[in-house]
């Protein structure tokens, strides 16, 4: 699947225009995009990064990493996904960067999601849904998620997000209404961010392959 990821990432470069500040996500597919972006780094003004991991890789390529507070609205955000449904709703957060990813997606006019074919699903939920949580609320949030969804929340032990929080991965979900679930989970006190990108789905999904498909 690594070749499919690379091909999806290379196709996303077609959406990068001269003078842009590019929002950049996190993960193995995005790493290929950053490498491709490095080849045209002289054409862009810089990037806004969703994680320390991506920031380090961008800087290795000599791309300036900018503060979103100083850039205003971004023209383009490119990121991967753990799952993608036919409506371009996503599960994201396997790399624990979901909060910053969601902030940058919200701040961007266009959100391009790059995936390999294994990430396409008819219904979201086979991949455990990440939820970023304030540490003191971990048990409270887990109980409320169980009561609300019937899914099984599992603490991702040993993982601390770039924001200093913890992650619960919710297993055994069958998400037929991702917009409603995103809204309801966000209302639980202690939840920082839910790894459902449904209220703000991707605008374009690029599925890697010998001939990448654009959805």
UniProtKB/Swiss-Prot annotation:
Q: What is its EC number?
A: 5.3.1.6
Enzyme class, spelled out: isomerase
Which InterPro entries does its entry note? NagB/RpiA_transferase-like (IPR037171), Ribose5P_isomerase_typA_subgr (IPR020672), Ribose5P_isomerase_type_A (IPR004788)
Binding positions (substrate): 26-29, 79-82, 92-95, 119
Q: Which NCBIfam families match?
A: PRK00702.1, rpiA
Task: Write down the PANTHER family for this protein, in alphabetical order.
Answer: RIBOSE-5-PHOSPHATE ISOMERASE (PTHR11934:SF0)
* Family indicated by similarity: Belongs to the ribose 5-phosphate isomerase family.
Q: Quaternary arrangement and interactors, per the entry?
A: Homodimer.
Query: What is the name listed in the Swiss-Prot or TrEMBL entry for this protein?
Result: Ribose-5-phosphate isomerase A
The species is Xanthomonas campestris pv. campestris (strain ATCC 33913 / DSM 3586 / NCPPB 528 / LMG 568 / P 25)
Q: Which gene produces this protein?
A: rpiA
């Amino acid at each position: 699947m690594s070749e499919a990821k690379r091909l999806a990432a290379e196709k996303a470069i077609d959406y990068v225009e001269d003078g842009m500040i590019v929002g950049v996500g996190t993960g193995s597919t995005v790493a290929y995009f950053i490498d491709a972006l490095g080849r045209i780094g002289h054409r862009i003004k810089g990037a806004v990064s969703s994680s320390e991991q991506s920031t380090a890789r961008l800087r290795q390529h000599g791309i300036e990493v900018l503060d979103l507070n100083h850039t205003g609205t971004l023209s383009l955000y490119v990121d991967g996904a753990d799952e993608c449904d036919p409506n371009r709703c996503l599960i994201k957060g396997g790399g624990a960067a979901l909060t910053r990813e969601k902030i940058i997606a919200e701040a961007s006019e266009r959100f391009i999601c790059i995936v390999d074919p294994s990430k396409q699903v008819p219904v979201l939920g086979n991949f455990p849904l990440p939820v970023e949580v304030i540490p003191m609320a971990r048990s409270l949030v887990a109980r409320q998620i169980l009561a609300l969804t019937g899914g099984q929340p599992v603490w991702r032990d040993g993982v601390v997000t770039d924001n200093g929080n913890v992650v619960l991965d919710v297993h055994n979900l069958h998400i037929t209404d991702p917009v409603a679930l995103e809204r309801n989970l966000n209302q639980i006190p202690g939840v920082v961010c839910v790894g459902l990108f449904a209220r703000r789905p991707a605008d374009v999904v690029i599925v890697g392959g010998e001939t990448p498909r654009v959805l």
